[in-house]
Regions:
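A generic structural micro-feature
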Residues: 30-32, 59, 93-95, 143-145
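Buried hydrophobic packing segments
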Residues: 197-207
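Short helix-capping/linker segments at secondary-structure and domain boundaries
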Residues: 205-216
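Acidic, metal-coordinating catalytic segment for phosphate/diphosphate chemistry
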Residues: 28-74, 82, 88
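Unchanged
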Residues: 44, 53-54, 63-66, 102-195, ...
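Alpha-helical and coiled-coil interaction segments, frequently adjacent to or embedded
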Residues: 1-24, 29-32
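Conserved Nudix-box catalytic region and its N-terminal flanking loop in Nudix hydrolases
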Residues: 2-5, 56-61, 73-118, 167-169, ...
């Protein structure tokens, strides 16, 4: 184990893409998602050379944007509720209808803010005022390539209501307006249990005061 100073520490990760040798790649499935199988070798820690050849499967999908609509005047957030097939497949007792932040895939030529504004209209019937980035992260890098960019958008929460979604995509999405304090309790209680929403709401819990000051 290496101990690092608390201030001014750059990333301790030294290996790069050049330290991976891809010896083979094939597409196993191509539909809404693409599934690929890689054969590869990679550099080992402690100067122990290269690994044996290993096989790794990866799910390929477009990168996406998550949006947390926030009303700084009312101190409320807008969430959506919809059926999620992954939650259904998880075979849990919990409902497969999840409370989530708004989200959508990035189309060719779009930037994250454009996606956030489009999805806010499509999924919640709301218009964003100011919008800013929170962070971005790899959703599940052990088996998927997707990077999710999370944004927070200023809204008038009194305009958020009803059921929305695109008919051609068979979306059926219900809108919820909830106080910031309540959604933070829901995160702690496990009512909200999907990663993008938890990350966005924890960010808001840390930064809401600064955000109110920025957007006043």
């Amino acid at each position: 184990m290496t101990l690092y100073p608390q201030d001014g520490q750059s990333s301790p990760v030294n290996f790069k893409k050049k330290d991976v040798e891809i010896t083979g790649c094939k597409t196993l499935y191509k539909g809404f998602f693409t599934l690929k199988s890689y054969q590869l070798r990679h550099k080992l820690f402690d100067n122990k050379g290269m690994s044996n050849e290993i096989v790794r499967e990866v799910l390929i999908r477009d990168h996406a944007v998550g949006l947390l609509p926030y009303d700084p005047l009312l101190d409320q957030v807008v969430l959506i509720e919809q059926l999620r097939i992954g939650a259904l497949e998880a075979n849990e007792d919990n409902s497969p209808w999840l409370l989530e932040i708004i989200a959508g895939m990035i189309k060719t030529g779009e930037n994250p803010e454009e996606v956030a504004r489009r999805e806010a209209r499509e999924e919640a019937g709301i218009e964003l005022k100011r919008c800013r980035s929170m962070l971005s992260y790899l959703a599940s890098p052990g088996g998927m390539n997707e990077r999710l960019s999370i944004m927070v958008g200023e809204v008038d929460a009194t305009t958020a209501k009803g059921v929305h979604g695109l008919l051609e995509e068979n979306e059926n999405i219900r809108v919820h307006v909830v106080s910031r304090e309540q959604v933070c309790r829901w995160v702690e209680e496990g009512v909200i249990d999907n990663a993008a929403s938890i990350i966005a709401l924890q960010w808001l819990a840390l930064h809401f005061q600064a955000l109110k000051e920025e957007w006043k």
